[in-house]
Amino acid sequence: MQTSPLLEALTEALRCLPGVGPKSAQRMVFHLLQRDRSGGMRLAQALTRAMSEIGHCADCRTFTEQPVCTICANPRRQQSGQICVVESPADIHAIEQTGQFAGSYFVLMGHLSPLDGIGPDDIGLGRLQERLENESIEEVILATNPTVEGEATANYIAEMCAHYGVMASRIAHGVPVGGELEMVDGTTLSHSLAGRHPIKF
């Protein structure tokens, strides 16, 4: 039982974070109060600003405090003719770290899931359709997760692209670098075999 309502409220608030249970939240609270009150104040200020000032990019729907994010505001990225469709802003960061993509993005903020009542309008496909209609898009790279929902979402968007005469491609899925075949699941191995490519000398 907590000795302070504020302690209890803060502990409960921290539990909204993924992977944080009662014990972890309590340890965080005690650490901030005992050892790092200034850090706690900075955290509170940063959270308050972020929650009130960060919105969505008007073009790609990623998180930004500006009307348009820095990637969408870059003329070179817009002129590439490529849009990479991802499920979350975190996926953009992962792809950007590779340094292999120089186009623009579109963030779904999820995936199609009829059983959960999530349809095309809920993941912003209307906005993607507008971009296909109004921009000079040559290729849409579908980088949704390799799940049942992710594949269904990719197929739906691929059909949409076909309607506008835009090429749709799917990122490759397969055996991870350094992985061993005996440890790979059957579905991943099937994708690897289907996506094999010739070795050129």
Curated annotation (Swiss-Prot):
Coiled-coil regions listed: none
Gene transcribed to yield this protein: recR
Gene Ontology terms for molecular function: DNA binding; zinc ion binding
Record protein name field: Recombination protein RecR
Function: May play a role in DNA repair. It seems to be involved in an RecBC-independent recombinational process of DNA repair. It may act with RecF and RecO.
A Pfam family it matches: RecR_HhH
Family recorded in the similarity comment: Belongs to the RecR family.
SMART domains referenced in this protein's UniProt entry, alphabetically: TOPRIM
Residue span(s) of domain Toprim: 81-176
Keywords of the record: DNA damage, DNA recombination, DNA repair, Metal-binding, Zinc, Zinc-finger
ZnF (C4-type) residues: 57-72
PANTHER family: RECOMBINATION PROTEIN RECR
InterPro entries on file: DNA_Rcmb_RecR, Rcmb_RecR, Rcmb_RecR_Znf, TOPRIM_dom, TOPRIM_RecR
Transmembrane segments: none
NCBIfam families with a match to the protein in the record: recR
GO biological process: DNA recombination; DNA repair
